[in-house]
Amino acid sequence: MTRPVRTRFAPSPTGFIHLGNIRSALYPWAFARKMKGTFVLRIEDTDLERSTEASVDAILEGMAWLGLDYDEGPYYQMQRMDRYREVLAQMLEKDLVYPCYMSTEELDALRERQRAAGEKPRYDGTWRPEPGKVLPEPPAGVTPVLRFRNPLTGSVVWDDAVKGRVEISNEELDDLVIARPDGTPTYNFCVVVDDLDMGITHVIRGDDHVNNTPRQINILRALGGEVPVYAHLPTVLNEQGEKMSKRHGAMSVMGYRDAGYLPEAVLNYLARLGWSHGDAEIFSREQFVEWFDLEHLGKSPAQYDHNKLNWLNNHYIKEADDARLAELAKPFFAALGIDADAIARGPDLVGVMGLMKDRASTVKEIAENSTMFYRAPAPDAQALAQHVTDAVRPALAEFAAALKTAEWTKEAIAAALKAVLGAHKLKMPQLAMPVRLLVAGTTHTPSIDAVLLLFGRDVVVSRLAAALA
């Protein structure tokens, strides 16, 4: 294909947008970037009952968070109604469509008869004009729908980039309604006009659209358009093997941000959820774009794996700038009741991020594990009784005294600890555990010297002294 590459993401703003939905934006975005093409955003908002502005905002917010920038749009189908009506008028003039007066009740009865006879239920062409055919008299007071004259013979064939060669006999397709009685165009018609007007060369979308494709190709050809390359992506399954959906517990795209995931981790994970480049699991956005192709799109449904996403997010957290993590963590601290003033009074937040991030799967988890730095210690009574014994108190007092004059470095703190351990013939946990409890309020911390360094000399010495008084 010699035309400049133009791809599109065309969501319906009817509610929830999850990873399975946004993947249909990621792949066409990546292909357009790889091919130095154009990525178009189109909002298919003709379902007036279900389309909402909040859903549009969720789509735009999710794309922006993942860095899926678009070159054109967003185009809104409801703002293109005049164009659709213009094309409908042209098709009427060229006899490509015809009015059909069959009522819903008549169509339902027809389908029931067909099912009873073991036939595929479909419109039978009652109102389709043919040479020598006498049409029924139009019923009074009935406004017709417009149906597309689908070819009666031959097949629709396309080479799908995922599914391979697909061939559908035109005998399987009835004459599609492309305009309702009130004149509003239907989904399949609007899509074709949009793809034609916008010069879309590659349609990369979920395989729930594959049944629409032969109908859209026939309409496109009737309008003189060039058929794009189609790539129908297998569905995304949840961890239970069901189709990913809100009903089955899927999280919204922005829900991942709100749970403390980094966009680069989600993008990396999403890229691998239906595409591969050898055994590569971790790659940057730039590397993904460089590698992306249609040939390596998966042909089987991809299954969401939350543990794998956590593993990836942990990798990106460890690689992330500590100052960036500190900013991202602040809302999570606030949700835990630790406000900006409390953070300002406590240890350097950037330093806390650097110490605590390696063990965390999410930024939220970093905040949860770091509350000890910004709250007064409240150790469990049973833990105190277990670790802060009369036998260890002299060693604690000696350690506290040593810290008053020691150089305040990680190495000096470790040296003071080692000296006290040797003098009192104690093992590391016998002294480190009570120190952790008395200073941090918990025995679960990273290395004791690093933790004490962040708390600062004054806090450490005063908390040990208060506990030993």
UniProtKB/Swiss-Prot annotation:
Compartments it resides in: Cytoplasm
Annotated GO MF terms: ATP binding; glutamate-tRNA ligase activity; tRNA binding; zinc ion binding
UniProt keyword terms in alphabetical order: Aminoacyl-tRNA synthetase, ATP-binding, Cytoplasm, Ligase, Nucleotide-binding, Protein biosynthesis
Short sequence motif 'KMSKS' region: positions: 243-247
Keyword flag GTP-binding: no
Catalytic activity: tRNA(Glu) + L-glutamate + ATP = L-glutamyl-tRNA(Glu) + AMP + diphosphate
EC number annotated for this UniProt entry: 6.1.1.17
A cellular-component GO term for this protein: cytosol
One biological process term in Gene Ontology: glutamyl-tRNA aminoacylation
Keyword Magnesium included in the entry's annotation: no
Region (Disordered): 118-139
Record-stated family: Belongs to the class-I aminoacyl-tRNA synthetase family. Glutamate--tRNA ligase type 1 subfamily.
InterPro entries, alphabetized: aa-tRNA-synth_I_cd-bd, aa-tRNA-synth_I_codon-bd_sub2, aa-tRNA-synth_I_CS, aa_tRNA-synth_I_cd-bd_sf, Glu-tRNA-ligase_bac/mito, Glu-tRNA-synth_I_codon-bd_sub1, Glu/Gln-tRNA-synth, Glu/Gln-tRNA-synth_Ib_cat-dom
Known partners and oligomeric status: Monomer.
PROSITE patterns tied to this protein: AA_TRNA_LIGASE_I
NCBIfam families given in the database record: gltX_bact
Protein name stated in the entry: Glutamate--tRNA ligase
Extent of motif 'HIGH' region: 11-21
Biased composition (Basic and acidic residues): 118-131
Residues that coordinate or bind ATP: K246
Cited function: Catalyzes the attachment of glutamate to tRNA(Glu) in a two-step reaction: glutamate is first activated by ATP to form Glu-AMP and then transferred to the acceptor end of tRNA(Glu).
Source organism phylogeny: Bacteria, Pseudomonadati, Pseudomonadota, Betaproteobacteria, Burkholderiales
